[in-house]
Amino acid sequence: MNGRGPVGPPRSGPVRSPATRRAGGDPLIRLFHVSKSYGPGSVALRDLSVEVRKGELVFLSGPSGAGKTTLMKLLFAAERPTEGQILVLGRNVARLGERRIPALRRRIGVVFQDFKLIQTRSIEENVALALQVLGRPPREVRSKAFAMLRRVGLQHRRHELPAALSGGEQQRVALARALVNEPAILLADEPTGNLDAELTIEIMDLVAAAAARGTTVLVATHDQALIRRYARRTLRLAGGRLLEDIPGGSI
């Protein structure tokens, strides 16, 4: 079903799956006819309209080059759309001034496939950094960093450097860092791409638990077995276009 969006003169509103319509509250993410081009003959996204509500766990599926990573970058303002409008937490990302981008990113947690941990800092320091940049008091930083590491089962290794941990453990640290300031949105770009099957489930269970606590989660993955296992709403992309918006339980 297509509705009309609240901004601009869109030709039709964002795609809403049945699962989305049942969700409570207003959408935290809304895209209206979004396209992203890197030059002639290099179009990453084409006329994408979709919305995601609070507490949804949504998979972004598609082959390499489908536009999954580009969409993630647009949502946390690492890039700007060539056309269209993007509302994230009520803010028009396409028009957001550079000075206001940090405030938006403080409410968005991001997990990358390659972890992006600071190798010269301890596990606890990596997680604490997300709170320190917000100016939180040292006592609160230590308490919340420890509590989050305990949630992912790594509090006993908090003083070690990332290189001492396995790939799965480093990904858990990256997830703890992304969630420690209780973001409204979590973006996970191929978070299990380098992990074996057992560790993949371990990480995805933590991601699903974040959604159950009310965080809106988008997970980019090409792992169809993972999508079938969790049976959540799935946006299938190909060639930068949205081919299907499949409600949870339909795969």
Where do the language-model regions lie?
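Helix-to-loop junction immediately C-terminal to a conserved catalytic motif
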Residues: 76
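Conserved ABC transporter NBD signature motif
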Residues: 84-92, 104, 144
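ABC ATPase NBD coupling module
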Residues: 93-109, 138, 212
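Short coil-to-helix segment of the ABC ATPase nucleotide-binding domain corresponding to the Q-loop/switch region
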Residues: 121-129
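Conserved catalytic motifs of ABC-family nucleotide-binding domains
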Residues: 182
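Catalytic Walker B motif of ABC-type/P-loop ATPase nucleotide-binding domains
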Residues: 186-189
